[in-house]
């Protein structure tokens, strides 16, 4: 074998081994029961289970992915909210995104008809949440969702939380475009409005952010992970206690504006 083909073989084996590892920690009753796509030694989370389920779909395990999505729909709250772990507030948008990716792979219209009522209930929950925060001047969090996105108790209008919400609403509009154009337009308009509010808040954050040096000698503004704070929280520009999980950089590197790439 050539060096290139050997490397490709190793990569292929690693990918397939990863899939089997995830299969080992996905629990449920065969042949058709709901599956729980756990995160190692703790339960499924809409955000952290999303790449697991989407990886399964990308490898052709569409039935497994569908049953794993079912976990979040089975446990959905009566008001449409989805939450399974440690008070995390971002699962609803992340699950809607994963549903959209599943539909992109499968175009399973029978499944879409089955999940549509619960999917729309989740959308209406996000819509009402957004409406509660449409107060004050545009920018600095207007119309954005507020709540914690990970282990730290940060109940702010974060870009991670809202990036997932936008992506979820956008995927719902995409899924319904052919079968229910009127409903699709409603959620496309809602997603686009959230995107505009997100961009205005992000630009406001960039305007007030300090600049930091880059590797090529240039400087760039470094915004905060949420609205209303000046720059990366690890710089303590506006004070606060930000040490968590053995690092000062966790919030800025893992929970911040990088999720706006979804737009």
Feature-to-residue mapping (PLM):
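Substrate-binding groove/exosite segments of carbohydrate-active enzymes
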Residues: 2-113, 157, 236-263
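Long, well-ordered core segments of solenoidal/helical folds
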Residues: 18-30, 60-81, 115-137, 190-209, ...
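General N-terminal targeting signals
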Residues: 52, 69, 73, 99, ...
